[in-house]
């Protein structure tokens, strides 16, 4: 894993190339959450892209073209347009931003002579061929720039036209400051970390994190498994989790993982009690029970107070902490205590804390602890693949130092 991260660290960064009077296309990640009125509820990803954009402004790039996706549109969907982002961008950058409906309109605007201009292209996923890594679309985007900058860590594990494809055909292709910061932070967590190194994994499914867990056992010392995915492990150990969500097909995989952890001397912690309910969406009865005594027809919705105490003690002894996935159904206030408590606990330690996953970040924001974590990764799937020991495809096509 470290060798692969080192390979990705060898990618050239924007500060190593001359952008003066150059046309720069930056693949940013503005895939941010919106409310029902299409207002941005968390602009973290937009703010994280600002240093790269500002660098281009300060170094007098001729034109700066921002390309991003938003959501998973099927064709053109007005509710997923990037046009409403203009005002937020202009306020954050203190600079005018011009919206381009399509590539043809953008090309026409680029022909006009003017001092440094910033363009925001409409949601790139509105264009057919983006997710298929269409070569013609990639070449079209690459033709717009002298320098291509990938600053979208969250999509760097996907071979899309605006990330992987454009980099292949651009004359100069480098990483932005955010991309560099992401890789450097992951490398810091695993290259001679202060030990014990603790990994906390939560979330709904074992299947989404099984590869991660198998590959990372050689690097960690302690492992907390919580969230709905822990139900599968509890059932594998013989506990009756009643109506709780379980991936029965992965019972044997869970047992094998626990055995592998034992052989590698990784201490594994599972919940010892739980907050359960008759109905997660409309709870009428909520109860705290030991995991060996779950109420019939109840579902596990959060970890209980005894588990919180146990996990707190583990966290207090860990100088390096990685966390991916909530510990319960944190979207509902009744079942958010475990995740919120954990966020406060990690924030109040001296540990180097690296946080990944959209749900985890959302929970940390709700807890008001965003500024108290060492590093919050902007990538969900990308950070998981990195932890699984993979080289993210989009790094392969960027220019290397040597």
UniProtKB/Swiss-Prot annotation:
Listed Pfam families: PGK
Positions contributing to ATP binding: 209, 331, 357-360
PROSITE patterns per the UniProt record, alphabetical: PGLYCERATE_KINASE
GO molecular function terms listed in the Swiss-Prot or TrEMBL record: ADP binding; ATP binding; phosphoglycerate kinase activity
Enzyme class, spelled out: transferase
Pathway: Carbohydrate degradation; glycolysis; pyruvate from D-glyceraldehyde 3-phosphate: step 2/5
A GO CC term assigned to this protein in UniProt: cytosol
Primary site of residence: cytoplasm
Disulphide bridges, residue numbers: none
Annotated catalysed reactions: (2R)-3-phosphoglycerate + ATP = (2R)-3-phospho-glyceroyl phosphate + ADP
Keyword Nucleotide-binding: yes
Domain of life, source organism: Bacteria
Protein name as catalogued: Phosphoglycerate kinase
Organism per entry: Helicobacter pylori (strain J99 / ATCC 700824)
């Amino acid at each position: 894993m470290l060798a692969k991260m080192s390979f990705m660290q060898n990618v050239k960064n924007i500060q190593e190339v001359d952008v003066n009077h150059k046309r720069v296309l930056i693949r940013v990640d503005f895939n941010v959450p919106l409310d029902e009125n299409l207002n941005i509820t968390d602009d973290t990803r937009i703010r994280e892209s600002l240093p790269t954009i500002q660098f281009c402004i300060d170094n007098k790039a001729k034109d700066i073209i921002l390309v991003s996706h938003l959501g998973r549109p099927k064709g053109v969907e007005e509710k997923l347009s990037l046009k409403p982002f203009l005002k937020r961008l202009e306020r954050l950058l203190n600079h005018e931003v011009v919206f381009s409906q399509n590539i043809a309109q953008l090309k026409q605007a680029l022909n006009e002579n003017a001092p440094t201009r910033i363009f925001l292209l409409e949601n790139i996923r509105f264009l057919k061929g983006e997710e298929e890594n269409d070569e013609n679309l990639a070449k079209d985007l690459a033709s717009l720039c002298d320098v291509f900058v990938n600053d979208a860590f969250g999509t760097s594990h996907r071979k899309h036209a605006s990330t992987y494809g454009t980099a292949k055909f651009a004359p100069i292709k480098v990483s932005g400051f955010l991309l560099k910061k992401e890789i450097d932070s992951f490398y810091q967590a695993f290259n001679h970390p202060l030990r014990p190194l603790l990994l906390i994994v939560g979330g709904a499914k074992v299947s989404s994190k099984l590869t991660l867990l198998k590959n990372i056992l050689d690097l960690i010392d302690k492992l907390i498994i919580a969230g709905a995915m822990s139900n599968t492990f509890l059932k594998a150990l013989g506990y009756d989790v009643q109506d709780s969500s379980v991936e029965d097909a992965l019972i044997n995989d869970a047992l094998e993982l626990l055995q592998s952890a034992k052989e590698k001397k990784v201490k594994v912690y599972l919940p010892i009690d739980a907050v359960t309910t008759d109905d997660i969406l409309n709870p009428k009865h909520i109860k705290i029970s030991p995991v060996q005594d779950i109420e019939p027809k109840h579902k596990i919705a959060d970890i209980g107070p005894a588990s919180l105490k146990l996990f707190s003690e583990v966290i207090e002894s860990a100088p390096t902490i990685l966390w991916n996935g909530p510990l319960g159904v944190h979207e509902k206030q009744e079942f958010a205590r475990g995740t919120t408590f954990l966020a406060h606990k990690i924030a109040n330690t001296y540990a180097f804390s690296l946080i990944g996953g959209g749900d985890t970040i959302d929970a940390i924001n709700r807890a008001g602890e965003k500024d108290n974590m060492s590093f919050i990764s902007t990538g969900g799937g990308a950070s998981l693949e990195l932890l699984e020991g993979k080289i993210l495809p989009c790094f392969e096509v960027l220019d290397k130092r040597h």
